[in-house]
């Protein structure tokens, strides 16, 4: 397929490259020129503007947005509405709030422009391993763009979740679970680190990957973290929250579903900004490993 990609950050740039490797044609646009030039070297078709990107696509046109949630998504949709026509498709692959996705889909309906919300997991490793995709929208439209999902995802790694908003809802809960998992691992390593024994956290995170009931990809990343910096002394225990954890807690409250672990892990991140905690340093380091998220180092203070 031929697709437009707007937003060439850590995720958008790698997704563009994976699509190119899968023999898709990708027209790219970004607010700054550097990432466009970099993508063009790998075979992408550069665009000078959103209008230029749309002009270079065949009908029905498919445009993937990989920009930060909130205003950037709305701004790009407003710009795209000037040029897209009935049955053209906008895919929002960012971490948008699911209710915003519902509103955006509704606002596009009068023009006949189709909207697909797609939760994307895989972080900086997605180029090599593939991205887990959770998407929602009109079923016929989603079936039409399935070749894109098939290329981006590993085998069995993409799922049609339901109508507009459902993809980002599933991704929201996915990230809420991630909050709880990271918190549990980090607290465990903090208990190990503070024990009377001289324990090798790298070796422990390694052995737990073989046959243990707690084995996971996160432990593989933990092994990398502790190999590079066994004490995490250079890190501040400051952990950002990206929004989805908060939204998951809010959804749980609205739906009268108790979610104490996810709630506690969110509060722990907020509290991390005023504490010196080994567990919070561990979470910060792990988030950097899987998502390329920024870490705050003591030298930055």
Mark where each language-model region is:
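NAD(P)+-binding Rossmann beta1-loop-alpha1 motif at the extreme N-terminus of oxidoreductases
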Residues: 1-62, 87, 124-126, 288
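Helical "substrate-binding/catalytic lid" subdomain
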Residues: 134, 144, 165-293
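Hydrophobic residues within alpha-helices
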Residues: 15-19, 80, 104
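Rossmann-like NAD(P)-binding element
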Residues: 31, 44-103, 109, 127-136
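Anion (oxyanion) recognition and catalysis
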Residues: 20, 40, 102, 109, ...
